[in-house]
Regions:
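Detector for small/aliphatic-rich hydrophobic stretches
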Residues: 2-5, 16-93, 110, 114
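Residue-level signature of catalytic and energy-coupling elements of molecular machines
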Residues: 22, 79, 127, 167, ...
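Conserved inter-motif catalytic segment of the P-loop NTP-binding fold
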Residues: 87, 95-98, 106-193
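Walker A/P-loop
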Residues: 101
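Phosphate-binding/switch region of NTP-binding enzymes
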Residues: 195-230
């Protein structure tokens, strides 16, 4: 049976408090403390067993040579160290209206790979009109307008794309926790799940994130440390 309790955490530094505070005493940020619902499930320690097959000496671990996905943009390839690394999670942030979605859509329809573009902000028709302005070659780019993480993962399992795009992380929510869409716990939980998917499948995920009026990425500060590239 899951136990539920409420705590309050700072979006800026991650400090936690038993009650709401107008100013975070750790970093000094005002109005950055939000309610967070934590659900914990007690595990029976006697049922926990060690899987010895997962233990490997480092010299016995085999590595795979996975080629990076090359982008038709020399500057972006340079920034990413030569292209998109399989299984990596890339966070693209910027002010609203600056062109994040257009840039990522341009990449999606130009890399000649099967791309699943998930939008929680625009309709398929809006994305199609923008794609028409970018290029006539629009094959292998699949558009899904959805905000529920569980339904998104079902689409990923069905399509098994080469690249996944999330536009934007602030619009995605999971049924596994009760917090509202865009809240700090939702962003952390959804990002954590997407990272697991990327590492387990080898599918790189490009995540678009908004920034605040202060120029910081909206949501928990830890988000920047969870992903591979910002």
């Amino acid at each position: 049976m899951a136990n539920t309790k409420k705590i309050y955490s700072c979006n800026n530094c991650g400090a936690k408090y038993p009650k709401w505070m107008g100013q975070c005493s750790q970093c000094g940020e005002w109005n950055s403390v939000d309610e967070e619902i934590i659900q914990s499930k007690k595990k029976n320690e006697s049922n926990i067993t060690i899987n010895k097959s997962k233990l490997k000496e480092i010299k016995e671990i085999e590595t795979e040579t996975n080629e990076r996905i090359i982008i038709n943009d020399n500057e972006l390839n340079r920034v990413l160290g030569g292209g998109i690394v399989p299984g990596s999670v890339i966070l693209i942030s910027g002010e609203p209206g600056i062109g994040k979605s257009t840039l990522i859509l341009q990449i999606s329809i130009s890399i000649n790979k099967k791309v699943l573009y998930i939008s929680g902000e625009e309709s398929q028709q809006q994305i199609k009109l923008r794609a028409n302005r970018i290029s006539d070659n629009q094959t292998q780019c699949y558009i899904l307008t959805e905000t529920n993480l569980e339904l998104i993962l079902k689409s990923v399992e069905s399509l098994m794309p080469d690249v996944i795009v999330i536009d934007s992380i602030q619009t995605i929510q999971t049924d596994s926790i009760e917090n509202i869409q865009g809240s700090t716990p939702q962003i952390k939980e959804c990002t954590s799940t997407l990272i697991k998917v990327a590492k387990q499948t080898g599918i790189p995920i490009i995540v678009i994130g908004h920034i605040t009026k202060d120029g910081n990425i909206a949501g928990p500060k830890v988000l920047e440390h969870m992903v591979d590239v910002v």
